[in-house]
Amino acid sequence: MTQDLADMLTRTARLIAGDGHAAGLKPVQWQALRYLAAANRFSRTPGALAAWLGQTKGTVSQTVAALERKGLVARTGDAGDRRLVRLALTPHGEALLASAPDTIAEAMLAPMAPADRAALEALLARMLGGFLAARGHRPFGLCANCRHFRRDAEGGNPHRCALLGVPLDESDSRAICIEQEAA
């Protein structure tokens, strides 16, 4: 890889990471909010957030505490496992994300032709996936694209996670999951 390419990737990542500054958030706080909005109910935990961000649990704990103080995130205990902490966006956190202008990434991608965007997405997915796999990190991914996803498996809930043995609704299937394994 050339140094120019590495520099462009780094600069692009830094510009995109700065999205939350207008809302008074540090880049990691903005990324945490965006993750919690995109993650399924099983993946909204401090441990999953740490894995997604590539940070230590201690660092993520400080990030979550700051977001709690700002009224953007709430912690709750899990009814089935009292050792487990669940994270959720508060209505204020949801409103902040909903009112955010187009992201820097969206502005960068907007002038690109659809074929170029698709090619870039495929290359970045391969690059990121290879990097994560080589280091033993979880890849995350959409629930509906997982090998454990069973479409139309339940009467009241249309789908099922065969790994966790739980019913899934449509919102679960469109969210990212820490347990996701490519189908």
Where do the language-model regions lie?
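N-terminal leader segment of winged-helix/HTH proteins
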Residues: 1-23
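Short amphipathic alpha-helical boundary/capping segments
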Residues: 15-26, 107-115
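N-terminal helix-turn-helix DNA-binding core of bacterial DNA-binding proteins
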Residues: 17-56
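Short alpha-helical DNA-recognition segment
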Residues: 26-27, 63, 71
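Charged, amphipathic alpha-helical coiled-coil/dimerization segments
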Residues: 66-118
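Mid-protein regulatory/catalytic core that forms ligand/cofactor-binding pockets
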Residues: 132-183
